[in-house]
């Protein structure tokens, strides 16, 4: 590489660092006062801003609003509120297949005790995988009202592609599903000696307790297993109709699996939930509907109304009348980050979409087996 090329590359790196230094001042939410030197637009890897109030079109309109609702869901779980999305004002995103979204929105709480005024919220959602539901919300806060659970000031701002997708700096390590007392003591010693961050030990405790809420998503349970009332709570129709997050989970599974639906809101409007079961770490909790509030849960949703699901290398039976299944895992981390991971069940794995099933033919269901809990 020539001296001139080295100089140009170093100049580009300098501009890049300066962009992210400025973006970090607002945790990636407010970019209005950030300017780039002439000729560097399109060269610097940065966030792309979208003004939803002025622009008639912007990427993934349905999905971005679902991400905004997901952030409010996290806030409501932590604070016991009922905030709902009123208006998506703006968002910034990375130009990647797997992106991070920094959203500013207006929300209101319909509870009369909360008053009728709207609040401005900031929500950050990071995608962890392309073509399926795997997202994390690390920031969901009223603007200028952050606290430790909503955004950590202990670690520097890290954009997604730098490997710091979690805005509150949670350090992810590979941990077995069940740690022995000896292993926990060794981790505790390493933390005391300053060899590991303190939250690694906390993560280990969660891993030990997490069990079925780690690793791959479970298969759809058999009817006999679902009838185990100690293990599964069958959500009443009145409850899921009053609980907007269950339908939001379903819409997120479908839209993240097929992002083309993000410009087709009419597809989601046809969805009809048939039944819902929830599995939590706490069994026989009284009253049973308290399990709806669990920080760690598997939500099993049977639904219809999706005429032609699309998923990577899979085809499904066609028809809105077909009952389909989706599984969503919810895990609230010990520092307040909320993760959702989900999948559509069924379909046949093939190489080419030209082999699509005709209407009326039976699709392969998720393998039915008892889960180990």
Swiss-Prot record:
The keyword Transcription does not apply. This is UPF0725 protein At1g23950. Disulfide bonds: none annotated. Belongs to the UPF0725 (EMB2204) family. Keywords: Acetylation. The keyword Acetylation applies. NCBIfam families: A_thl_para_3677. The modification N-acetylthreonine is found at residue 2. It comes from Arabidopsis thaliana. The lineage of its organism: Eukaryota, Viridiplantae, Streptophyta, Embryophyta, Tracheophyta. Pfam families: protein_MS5.
């Amino acid at each position: 590489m020539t001296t001139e090329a080295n100089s140009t590359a170093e100049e580009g790196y300098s501009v890049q660092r300066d962009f992210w230094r400025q973006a970090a001042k607002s945790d990636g939410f407010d970019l209005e006062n950030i300017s780039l030197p002439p000729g560097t637009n399109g060269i610097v890897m940065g966030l792309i801003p979208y003004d939803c109030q002025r622009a008639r079109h912007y990427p993934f309109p349905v999905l971005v609003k679902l991400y905004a609702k997901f952030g409010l869901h996290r806030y409501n779980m932590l604070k016991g509120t009922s905030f709902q999305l009123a208006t998506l004002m703006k968002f910034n995103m990375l130009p990647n297949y797997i992106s991070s979204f920094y959203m500013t929105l207006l929300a209101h709480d319909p509870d009369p005790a909360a008053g009728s005024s709207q609040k401005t919220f900031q929500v950050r959602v990071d995608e962890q995988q392309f073509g399926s539901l795997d997202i994390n919300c690390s920031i969901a806060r009223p603007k200028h009202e952050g606290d430790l659970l909503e955004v950590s000031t202990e670690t520097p701002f890290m954009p997604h592609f730098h490997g710091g997708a979690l805005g509150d700096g949670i350090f992810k390590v590979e941990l077995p599903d069940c740690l022995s007392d000896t292993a926990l003591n060794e981790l505790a010693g390493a933390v005391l000696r300053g060899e590991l961050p303190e939250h690694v030990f906390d993560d280990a405790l969660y891993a030990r307790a997490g069990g079925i809420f780690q690793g791959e998503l479970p298969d759809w349970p058999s009817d006999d297993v679902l009838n185990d009332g100690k293990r599964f709570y069958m959500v009443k129709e009145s409850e899921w109709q009053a609980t907007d997050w269950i339908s939001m989970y379903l819409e997120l599974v479908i839209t993240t699996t097929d992002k083309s639906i993000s410009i087709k809101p009419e597809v989601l409007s046809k969805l009809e939930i048939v039944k819902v079961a929830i599995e939590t770490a706490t069994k026989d909790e009284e009253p049973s509907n308290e399990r709806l509030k669990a920080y760690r849960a598997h939500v099993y949703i049977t639904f219809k109304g999706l005429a032609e699901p699309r998923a990577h290398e899979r085809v499904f039976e066609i028809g809105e009348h077909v009952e389909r299944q989706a599984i969503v895992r919810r895990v609230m981390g010990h520092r307040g980050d909320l993760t959702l991971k989900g999948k559509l069940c069924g379909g046949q794995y093939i190489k080419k979409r030209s082999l699509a099933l005709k209407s009326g033919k039976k699709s392969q269901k998720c393998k039915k087996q008892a889960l180990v809990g």
